[in-house]
Amino acid sequence: MKHGSLFSGIGGFDLAAEWMGWENIFHCEFEEYKQQKLKENFQKSDSYGDIRNFDSRKYKYKIDIISGGFPCQDVSIAQQSKKLGGAQGINGERTGLWKEYARVIREIEPGIIVFENSPMLLIRGFERVLCDLHKLGFDVEWRCFFASDFGYPHFRKRLYGVAYSRFKRWKDIAKSGGILSKVLPKRTPRQIPISIPLERFNSQSSYDNVRMDDGFSKELDKTVIHGFGNAVIPEIPYQIFKAIEQYETNRHTQAAQAGRTARAIP
């Protein structure tokens, strides 16, 4: 599989693709620190900055899967208390960059898109995402996952969506039961007590405890923490990618069986 990521952060989707043995073709990230980490960790990938300046037409028909979590600031709960009119939703300056995500999809025409965002997107502009993807020829499924569902010691509820082309080899995914229904294990780790001692991360006193050993400024430390705080948990896209690849394996198996059956008919 050939994979490209948008709004790549520090590379959660890219790492999951690497775990799968897929080829990371490109990543696209605006923030300098995150872009630096991407270049360090995925040196064979093409690297791009501001998505608004990303001309993706060179990748047309060359990418199987595009992934990424477009900005959620304008739909998140945190925006409700701000003085700028509250959450602006899909029309906001940051979350509104979805239109660039859609543009890249239109230019590249991949088979599958995997995206991530705040669950609040469901009531603050998700219909725009669905409408745009439908116009581009994709069917969409979506589901909210908790980090704790995958054994992590925090909840962090996030929305994940998988869109697949109605005109390519993935067009029958819906008939097979979809992708996201196959992601979670039967037993949910969220219900299992976690034996990791956790302290409440609180205010300045706690912040001082996570300063770097090399003596860099707190502002740089803050950038590092921000990078990890906004990152997707790689295990979640990894499980989604595994379900996608399993569909591919099943499709090839069924095609081979059908071929053998056809040859056996006198």
Question: What label would you give each PLM region?
Answer:
Residues 1-266:
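Conserved active-site and SAM-binding loop architecture
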